[in-house]
């Protein structure tokens, strides 16, 4: 069993911890978070320090790390932490819950989380650091851009393309062959039956431009 350290102790971390414990592949050393969280516990795990301690733990021989901060809208903290981990030399594995179904013909980038009872079907391509959350379905031949979040119970029908850092809300449905741009938010329960441009918020039939983009070079 390999050691792993987790970044961020919030609600999403609870789900990821469950999946790691279930698979039995990694031994969780603890969490890193903000100074305000130092010493706090979740189950048997403690917040050991801030992300400034990443180098120290890497030097101690811990080579695996995972970002357990959830999707933060227009923020790019997940992106920044991922880059920090890779610059130090950490491996950022995929965490796939034992109840999830992932096709052998699907492609997953680094740091993908696949939650309980989620499905990723044949020829789907999932970008680095995506979250495919509890009960979500990503059907055949879909492409999900890096740092995107397919939320609880949402359905991405066959051949759909989703851009980078886009949030597909809980129980939303994207009809087959549609394209959704980058930096979008699709509200919970929304049915997407037409293409969506970059930087759009869509709730039901209401759509507006967000006016923000994420600078991936920050």
Language-model features, listed with the residues they occupy:
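Short glycine-rich anion-binding loops that position phosphate/pyrophosphate groups of nucleotides
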Residues: 12, 70-73, 208
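Residues at the starts of beta-strands that form the adenosine-phosphate
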Residues: 3, 27-29, 64, 91
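Phosphate-bearing ligand-interacting subdomains
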Residues: 39-97, 101
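Glycine-rich adenosine-cofactor-binding loop
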Residues: 2-20
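Structural signal for interior beta-strand "rungs" in well-ordered beta-sheet cores
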Residues: 94-210
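NAD(P)-binding Rossmann-fold cofactor-contacting core
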Residues: 23-42
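Alpha-helical elements of the RecA-like P-loop NTPase motor core of helicases
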Residues: 14, 18, 76-79, 194, ...
């Amino acid at each position: 069993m390999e050691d792993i350290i987790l970044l961020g102790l919030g609600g999403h971390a609870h789900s990821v911890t469950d999946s790691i414990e279930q698979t039995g592949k990694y031994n969780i050393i603890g969490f890193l978070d903000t100074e305000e969280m130092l010493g706090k516990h979740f189950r048997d795990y403690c917040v050991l320090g801030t992300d400034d301690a990443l180098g120290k733990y890497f030097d101690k021989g811990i080579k695996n790390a995972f970002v357990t901060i959830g999707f933060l809208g227009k923020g790019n903290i997940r992106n920044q932490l991922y880059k920090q981990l890779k610059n130090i030399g950490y491996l950022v594995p995929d965490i796939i819950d034992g109840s999830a179904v992932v096709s052998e013909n699907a492609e997953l980038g680094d740091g993908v989380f696949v939650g309980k009872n989620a499905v990723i079907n044949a020829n789907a391509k999932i970008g680095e650091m995506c979250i495919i959350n509890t009960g979500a379905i990503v059907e055949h031949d879909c492409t999900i851009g890096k740092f995107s979040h397919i939320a609880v119970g949402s359905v991405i029908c066959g051949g759909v393309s989703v851009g980078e850092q886009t949030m597909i809300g809980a129980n939303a449905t994207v009809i087959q062959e549609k394209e959704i741009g980058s930096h979008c938010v699709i509200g919970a329960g929304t049915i997407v039956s037409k293409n969506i441009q970059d930087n759009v918020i869509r709730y039901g039939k209401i759509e507006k431009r967000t006016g923000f983009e994420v600078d991936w070079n920050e």
